[in-house]
Regions:
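Glycine-rich phosphate-binding loops of nucleotide-dependent enzymes
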Residues: 2-191
Length: 191
């Protein structure tokens, strides 16, 4: 069974059919590319797969579960993470806190546990810090963990966005032009 099965997917904005009758099957453990000219609808497809846009036709099935039209939070919890063409970080938050945002969809403690900062909250926060630092180290961002995200150079901001997406522990990772705007050295470092 495919990890992701897309059938007859489409979306129209008013009278403009942006994507029509897209069929796609993605197997677990493989690398795929969605290639096309500017304006072909690649980002629109990513937006439908992640719940940013609701398709006007078709189905999206992830790991046997229909996720068509679900909101982005539920789709993220189901196992799809993404990056964006234009970097979308929390610029005034620290680098480590940006990664921890991705970890929060896996952490389970009640509202009162968090408000009162009970031992379970402190334990989970410590665990998230450890996991976030592991990811930052992989992307050579661990030394900048306490910087504001906006203080990082562009190439490192790209890496941070990928680290945050990976923090969700996705089944499927969608990278929307991950090297856009990067110089050749930054691109090579990313690969």
């Amino acid at each position: 069974m495919a990890l992701l099965e897309v059938s007859n997917l489409g979306i129209a904005f008013g009278g403009l059919q942006a994507v029509a009758q897209l069929d796609l099957s993605i197997e677990k453990g493989h690398l795929y590319g969605l290639i096309g000219p500017n304006g072909a609808g690649k980002t629109t497809v990513f937006n439908m797969l992640t719940g940013v846009y609701k398709p006007t036709e078709g189905n999206i099935v992830l790991d046997g579960k229909d996720i068509t039209g679900q909101n982005p939070e539920l789709i993220s919890k189901s196992g799809i993470a993404r990056t964006f063409q234009n970097i979308r970080l929390f610029n005034e938050m620290s680098v480590i806190d940006n990664v921890k945002v991705g970890l929060h969809n896996q952490i389970k403690y009640g509202m009162w546990t968090g408000i009162l900062r009970l031992p379970a909250f402190k334990e989970k926060e410590h665990e998230m810090n450890r996991e976030a630092m592991k990811l930052l180290k992989i992307f050579d961002l661990d030394k900048e963990a306490n910087y504001k995200a906006s203080q990082l150079p562009y190439g490192k901001q790209r890496k941070l966005e990928i680290a945050r997406a990976l923090a969700t522990n996705p089944k499927l990772l969608l990278l929307d032009e991950p090297a856009a705007g990067m110089n050749p050295n930054e691109t090579e470092e990313l690969m």
